[in-house]
């Protein structure tokens, strides 16, 4: 009952415009619609400041170091249990907030936050391959695009430096399952990645413009980011590797040491409104987890090949869990070697 009263109190403040504070959001770069923030500020009177990060590990390390001043963070699902176990997140009980009724039922009882006691959906998507079809006309639904690159693409490949995504794709390419500790599979993964890297131009995050301008021709990227590339260059296509590819969800969480706790809870409730979730998707070009948001979405998102997974490739997409620490250590060793 205490949780219900607290949530009701926060919502009453929001409705009455009684906030006079601020909200500090720590989120992935180029991932937050300015229109969403403007709407939230107009409705609540809360001044929002956004700080960017480029990886889950960067965000986790920054917050663990302390003195950050952030209220909200948006981790990927595989990292949420880590944030919770480290005691970094507040149990804000989104399941008792007014707009929780809008959450799509399939996103409620998730492995990383059963019943949604800590987090609310921000965006969900896939990690696959991006190819400029002007320079390559072969099969793009394969991780061989970056793991055994065709001659035409060598030297023009960029791989996002997100260990979880790249390792899962390489493991599934060799017939393994996410979070495997099979030494034979991991030996093949290590050799394949090291050999493939000589054909990559880089391992960077902020590459949307480089793909659009054709400085890059292929690589590993997220579906929404690739969608935004295609809007600038129609030759760009997104592939779903038939060997397997990661599914993921980023969620809004409130930090336990947030100075603006009520404001942060109000933001969690705010993004569960369908029209607000649609604003997030409109900008970032990913799906969200809020039922009814489709009615407010741009028309081109409803049929986009980066959003609508081909029927024959749906079954090979996997939501991988949080790997055991010992397994994660094996992956980290491979990843560290790849950075040399």
Language-model-detected regions and their locations in the chain:
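Periplasmic-binding protein-like
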Residues: 102, 186-194, 232-256
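A ligand-binding cleft/hinge motif common to bilobed small-molecule-binding domains
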Residues: 79-82, 212, 217-235
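Mature extracytoplasmic/periplasmic domains
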Residues: 255-315
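A bilobed periplasmic-binding-protein/Venus flytrap-type ligand-binding module shared by bacterial periplasmic
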Residues: 130-135, 171-173, 249-263, 279-282
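Early extracytoplasmic/lumenal segment of secretory-pathway proteins
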Residues: 20-82
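Ligand-binding "clamshell"
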Residues: 84-91, 113-116, 228-240, 302-305
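Conserved C-terminal helix/tail region of periplasmic/extracytoplasmic solute-binding proteins
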Residues: 209, 311-340
């Amino acid at each position: 009952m205490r949780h219900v009263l607290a949530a009701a109190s926060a919502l009453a403040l929001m409705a009455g415009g009684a906030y006079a504070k601020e909200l500090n959001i720590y989120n992935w770069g180029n991932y937050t619609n300015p229109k969403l923030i403007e709407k939230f500020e107009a409705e609540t009177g809360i001044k929002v400041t956004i700080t960017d990060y480029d990886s889950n590990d960067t965000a986790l390390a920054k917050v663990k170091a302390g003195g950050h001043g952030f209220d909200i963070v948006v981790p990927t699902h595989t990292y949420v249990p880590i944030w919770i176990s480290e005691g970094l997140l507040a149990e804000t009980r989104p399941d008792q907030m007014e707009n929780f009724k809008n959450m799509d039922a399939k996103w409620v009882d998730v492995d990383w936050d059963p019943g949604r006691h800590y987090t609310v959906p921000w965006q969900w998507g896939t990690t696959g391959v991006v190819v400029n079809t002007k320079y390559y006309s072969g099969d793009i639904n394969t991780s061989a695009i970056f793991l055994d690159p065709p001659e035409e693409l060598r030297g023009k490949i960029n791989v996002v430096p997100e260990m979880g995504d790249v390792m899962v794709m390489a493991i599934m390419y060799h017939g393994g399952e996410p979070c495997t500790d099979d030494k034979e599979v991991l030996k093949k993964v290590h050799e394949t990645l090291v050999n493939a890297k000589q054909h990559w131009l880089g391992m960077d995050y902020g590459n949307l413009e480089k793909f659009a301008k054709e400085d890059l021709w292929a690589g590993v990227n997220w579906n929404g980011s690739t969608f935004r590339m295609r809007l600038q260059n129609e030759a760009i296509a997104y592939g779903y590797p038939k060997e397997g590819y990661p599914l993921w969800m980023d969620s809004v969480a409130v930090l336990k040491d947030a100075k603006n706790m009520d404001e942060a809870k109000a933001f969690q409730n705010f993004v569960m409104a369908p029209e607000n979730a649609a604003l997030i998707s409109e900008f970032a070009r990913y799906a969200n987890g809020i039922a009814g948001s489709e009615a407010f979405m741009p028309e081109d998102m409803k049929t986009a090949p980066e959003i609508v997974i081909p029927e024959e490739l749906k079954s090979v997409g996997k939501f991988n869990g949080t790997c055991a620490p010992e397994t994660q250590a094996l992956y980290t060793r491979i990843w560290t070697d790849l950075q040399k």
